[in-house]
């Protein structure tokens, strides 16, 4: 039976305390690698769906808005991100996630026989943890982390960390043995030990990471082309990396629990004009999946910090993010086929490591949109109508085709704000991102947010931390 750690739900507020079951993996007692793996998976999903992560990212990226001070009123809408939030997320990546994955790897290496597949599974999750951390903070501890002989790990450059992520994924791919039944299976909540799926995922995460790096380091295009030609990456919903929540108390999505804390009515997250308007312009069938109509049946978005509209009887006219997305058993989607397919479409449209091919890009683009709509429950007939009505990329200039691909990426990621924040920054050079955002009124910065500041706790505790945290408007290495 899979162990769902109740502590995963503690991240609903900015005052959450994580259980750190081992401070030093080199001195901790032996624990089943599968249990440690599952413990990390549960806490990771809880972090991603909890208030310390979901709220700052959804509000500051402006893929959602708060309806003004009488409704959500989130400080994060104006770029005030609590040090409790940054600290708790940092603790997950290092104390909970990274620390326990390293212990699981150590124990799998020392098992008899060595559990090579378990090591690979843990390395893939570790790679994704470090990818997420560096995409928030840039330079982070990596090469000297989780080493009991190093008290104060140095901060590695983002370029070094992302290359390290690629190395971890390559190591995992080399370790996977499809003929060996020994793997984390019972405790693998994602794929039940199916190493074919883990191999597919590792290739896809490698591709995604290269797509993040290639604008800053064009030499990565060759590796992108190699992966595209070889195939074997995430191609259907069956390959998705997804954490399944349930309707059972204690195993519900923390986003649902957040709404329960305010009486069970979703009035904290509203439709952003930056999201709803492009969807309406394209007659997107996901609109009723993403949003609730106003009391009069009309869908209306809001600007950042704009006050929600009501009628004379105080019924909401502005659209909130749908109850469907905040349901008890809403799954946490970490990586998926639509994200992969739209990235592949982009690669062909740009000619990254392959000949530019708008026809191939269009094929992948339409397939990605189909998968995105299907994931959110759009009826197949409505998907057909929508997709067949979209202009073909082959009729467009390369610039316009890329704009449409990036807009579909933006729309797809509305409820995945971390991925949204990454995608928006990589969608164009500063001032040319898709969509064009404006700095929120009353924001703590005169420029758009491009990163998080470091956890104050880490700044104080680690003498090798930067003396002063970079500001939220300062670009990361990958961000042009």
Model regions: which residues?
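Bacterial Sec-dependent N-terminal signal peptides
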Residues: 1-23
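Long, intrinsically disordered, low-complexity segments
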Residues: 33, 255-281, 287-291, 300, ...
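Membrane-proximal, proline-rich intrinsically disordered regions
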Residues: 15-67, 73, 95, 109-111, ...
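Intrinsically disordered or highly flexible coil/loop and linker segments, enriched in small
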Residues: 49-50, 374, 378, 414
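Structured, solvent-exposed acidic/aromatic patches
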Residues: 31-34, 66-376, 395-402, 408
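Surface-exposed intrinsically disordered loops and tails
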Residues: 381-389
């Amino acid at each position: 039976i899979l162990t769902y750690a109740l502590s995963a739900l503690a991240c609903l507020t900015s005052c959450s305390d994580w259980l750190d079951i081992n401070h030093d993996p080199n001195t901790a007692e032996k624990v089943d690698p599968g249990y440690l793996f599952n413990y990390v998976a549960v806490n990771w999903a809880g972090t991603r769906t909890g208030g310390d992560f979901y709220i700052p990212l959804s509000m500051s990226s402006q893929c959602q808005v708060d309806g003004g001070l009488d409704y959500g009123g989130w400080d994060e809408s104006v770029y005030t991100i609590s040090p409790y939030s940054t600290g708790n997320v940092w603790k997950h990546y290092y104390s909970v996630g990274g620390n326990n994955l390293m212990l699981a790897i150590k124990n799998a290496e020392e098992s008899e026989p060595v559990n090579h597949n378990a090591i690979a599974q843990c390395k893939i999750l570790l790679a994704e943890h470090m990818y997420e951390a560096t995409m928030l903070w840039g330079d982070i501890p990596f090469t000297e982390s989780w080493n009991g002989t190093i008290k104060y790990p140095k901060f590695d450059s983002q370029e070094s960390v992302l290359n390290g992520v690629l190395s971890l994924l390559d190591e995992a791919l080399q370790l996977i043995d499809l003929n060996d039944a020994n793997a984390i299976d019972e405790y693998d909540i994602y794929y039940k030990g199916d190493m074919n799926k883990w191999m597919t995922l590792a290739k896809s995460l490698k591709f995604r990471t290269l797509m993040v790096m290639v604008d800053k380091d064009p030499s990565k295009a060759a590796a992108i082309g190699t992966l595209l030609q070889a195939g074997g990456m995430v191609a259907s919903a069956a390959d998705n990396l997804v954490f399944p929540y349930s309707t059972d108390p204690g195993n519900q999505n923390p986003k649902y629990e957040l709404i329960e804390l305010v009486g069970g009515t979703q009035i904290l997250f509203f439709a952003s004009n930056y999201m709803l308007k492009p969807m309406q312009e394209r007659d997107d069938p996901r609109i009723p999946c993403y949003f609730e109509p106003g009391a009069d049946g009309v869908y209306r978005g809001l600007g950042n910090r704009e006050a929600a509209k009501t009628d004379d009887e105080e019924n909401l006219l502005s659209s909130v993010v749908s109850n469907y997305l905040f349901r008890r058993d809403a799954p946490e989607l970490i990586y998926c086929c639509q994200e992969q397919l739209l990235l592949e479409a982009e690669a062909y449209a740009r000619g990254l490591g392959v000949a530019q091919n708008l026809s191939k890009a269009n094929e992948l683009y339409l397939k990605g949109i189909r998968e995105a709509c299907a994931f959110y429950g759009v009826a197949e007939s409505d998907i057909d109508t929508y997709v067949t009505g979209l202009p073909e990329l082959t009729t467009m200039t390369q610039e316009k085709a890329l704009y449409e691909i990036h807009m579909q990426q933006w729309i797809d990621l509305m409820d995945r704000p971390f991925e949204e924040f990454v995608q928006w920054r990589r969608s164009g050079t500063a001032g040319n991102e898709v969509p064009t955002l404006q700095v929120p009124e009353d924001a703590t910065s005169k420029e758009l947010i491009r990163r998080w500041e470091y956890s104050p706790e880490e700044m104080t505790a680690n003498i090798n931390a930067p003396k002063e945290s970079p500001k939220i408007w300062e670009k990361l290495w990958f961000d042009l």
